[in-house]
């Protein structure tokens, strides 16, 4: 979704009203996108107590980054980063997620590692 240039609202409206044939063709940016998920303590086997998440605003100050917040437990949020290369997008995603604080949380450190080499 981070790479979608065409209006998602228009595409969904056309699809829901049976007029997808007259919808504009979906256009995507040539940039690469990387998403890293921040999970709460114990995920996926147990549910952690609700804790405060901080640093989202700081994370979103990283160029090309958007934070998609979901909840305070389980898969808490996703950090989506775009860049001209996978290496750049990956670097931005991990720079941003390092700014987010949630006691006991964790995230994978190998997302897009192979394609970013």
How would you describe each model-predicted region?
Residues 1-64, 68-70:
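Active-site "cap" helix and flanking loop/linker of ATP-utilizing ligase/carboxylase catalytic domains
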Residues 72-117:
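Generic C-terminus detector
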């Amino acid at each position: 979704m981070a790479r979608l240039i065409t209006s998602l609202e228009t595409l969904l409206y056309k699809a829901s009203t049976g007029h997808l044939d007259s919808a504009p063709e979906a256009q995507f940016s040539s940039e690469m996108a990387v998403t890293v998920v921040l999970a709460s303590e114990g995920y996926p086997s147990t549910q952690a107590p609700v804790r405060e998440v901080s640093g989202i605003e700081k994370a979103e100050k990283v160029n090309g980054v958007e934070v998609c917040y979901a909840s305070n437990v389980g898969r808490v949020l996703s950090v989506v980063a775009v860049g001209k290369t996978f290496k750049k997008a990956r670097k931005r995603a991990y720079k941003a997620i390092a700014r987010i604080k949630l006691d006991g949380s964790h995230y994978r450190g190998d997302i897009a590692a192979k394609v970013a080499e």
